[in-house]
Amino acid sequence: MQLNPHRAGRVWMLGGLILFLAGLGRAADVRVVGSDLLGLEFSQALYACAVREGIPLAVALDGSRPGYDQLASGRADLGLLTLPAGENPDPAGFTAVPLAWHRVVVIVAAATPLDRVTLADLAAVFGTDVPVSYNRWGDLGLRGEWEGRPVTALAAAQGAGLSEQIFRHLILQDRPLKSPLGRYTSAADLAFRLEGDGRVLALAAALPPQVAGLKLLPVAVRAEDPAFSPTPENLQSGDYPLRLALRVVFRRTAALRVLPVVRFILSEEVARVLERAELVPAPRSVRRQHALALEKP
């Protein structure tokens, strides 16, 4: 019997954890919880770090909200949480460090003569129950042969990542996307649709890799504001608005025990893992600054 990849990953992690704890002969010293979108590679990297450091480690990446509950109740020491700004643990009892960013990018064909969009534009293209609805490129300011062309709006298949949830929360106040709406099932499917239809305007977590002829549109909060691209620096500063932080959160009382793990999580090795999971790590200088600050007594 063959396991599917997700189940095989869970079995691998559980087996590795049992062997690691049994070899050390004691219960886990550091209990890590949080986002279920980080992937098997991230968990493997954490266990490899724990072996190097000699730290008994238990990892349960079952979701940010369950992780929050476990941190708040004292059943976990360290969390990797993606939560709206007002829902992070009390700073009096926890330290929170931004590690990376989930982002929503806006993609069009490179030949599309549009060089920026605003949040209101995106709401009008993708939203329901909004003051105005956009269906043609002329609504976005294009003229000439583009003015009457329909916009083909695309979003990821429901349940695929966080891009739709982030967009709905930040732009539509949690209202649903309009229906009917085109949906893509993978990065390859998105690339195929963008290459085959120059009228597409798509929301995604990242630009499909190794695909020419596409571009990311800078986003402005309002029409009179400058537009920003989704670079690490613009995500960190908040200039690019379509983003949600992945934070490392740990109990202050557990700071000494979790420090080696936190130091590793802020490393370049983990940054590369996060990139492969379609997150944008905080700039290296920012992560290094946080790591140095945590070393101080």
Where are the model-predicted features located?
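Bacterial N-terminal signal peptides that target proteins for export
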Residues: 2-13
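Bacterial N-terminal signal peptides
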Residues: 12-22
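Sec/Tat signal peptide C-region and signal peptidase I cleavage site
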Residues: 23-27
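Flexible loop/hinge segments at secondary-structure junctions
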Residues: 28-297
